Amino acid sequence: MLISSKNLLLTAREGGFAIPHFNFWDEMSAHAHVAAAEKKNVPILLAWAQKHEADIDIDEALILGKFYGAHAKVPIVLHLDHGFSPDLVKYGI
């Protein structure tokens, strides 16, 4: 299930736990991170970084992240604003 980072961070603060953050760079890595989160029954930040742009652009990352996040059995935050280009960071937000 996709949720907002604000909601997850508030829940983590109240529950006293940290949230793992994993970068994905293709479909297999996105799937693996979500599958591991489900196996451990923990929420995660599923993130794309601009350094992976040669392998997967931000629009493809959005499609993959939304798909795997929407089908996940645990809370997933899709995080697409890790970059060095201000325009890309704004687009990712």
Residue ranges and their predicted role:
Residues M1-P20:
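N-terminal amphipathic alpha-helix/helix-capping segment at the start of soluble metabolic enzymes
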Residues I3, F24-M28, I56, E60:
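Conserved active-site and cofactor/substrate-binding residues in soluble primary-metabolism enzymes
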Residues N7, H52-I93:
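N-terminal active-site wall of soluble small-molecule enzyme domains
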Residues A12, H33, A37, Y91-G92:
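Generic structural signal for hydrophobic
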Residues A18-N23, I44-W48, I76-H82:
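Hydrophobic faces of well-ordered beta-strands that scaffold small-molecule active sites
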Residues H21-A35:
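N-terminal glycine-rich phosphate/pyrophosphate-binding loops that anchor nucleotide-derived ligands
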Residues A35-K40, L62:
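Short, solvent-exposed amphipathic alpha-helical segments in soluble enzyme
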Residues E38, V42-E53:
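Short, well-structured secondary-structure segments
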